[in-house]
Amino acid sequence: MKDKIIDNAITLFSEKGYDGTTLDDIAKSVNIKKASLYYHFDSKKSIYEQSVKCCFDYLNNIIMMNQNKSNYSIDALYQFLFEFIFDIEERYIRMYVQLSNTPEEFSGNIYGQIQDLNQSLSKEIAKFYDESKIKMTKEDFQNLILLFLESWYLKASFSQKFGAVEESKSQFKDEVYSLLNIFLKK
């Protein structure tokens, strides 16, 4: 039941944020009474913290899965970027975007988790860097790709909400090829 509570809470927090989600909402989503939540968690805060942890674990797992299958070519970079934006469950993208509105009491912990995720992502992106094929420094390459991903996370959260995912995939394809053409040596 604890896992089901967290699973449903992730969806609720991703849609309504921390302040907009009540314990009643969470209890109703798993068909239990609000008082029964306290058997599993001592507060809404602890449910939220566990939900955030699961979100970051999920995103880190995507990075780890890429490490197991990537040949670190430019084509593999395109595939990784595409999967990191469009093959991730919508609620995790929206939860990640919602973290910018998290109450102050969580900010230190969440900021640390964001830094850890960005560090893992940056290390993974660095593996795609090939000096013989890319005409910018490794650091500039990493920063550009991270900036691209962050902007697309915002776009993806809105396109999923408004049902324009396929249109966004086409736009993404065009933009990522433009981006790759900017830094690839000819």
From Swiss-Prot:
It comes from the Bacteria. Residues 22-41 bind DNA. GO terms for molecular function: DNA binding. Residues 1-59 form the HTH tetR-type domain. Binding to the ica operator DNA involves two IcaR dimers and is highly cooperative. In strain COL, the gene icaC is interrupted by a natural frameshift. Homodimer. Represses transcription of the icaADBC operon necessary for biofilm production. This is Biofilm operon icaADBC HTH-type negative transcriptional regulator IcaR. It comes from Staphylococcus aureus (strain COL).
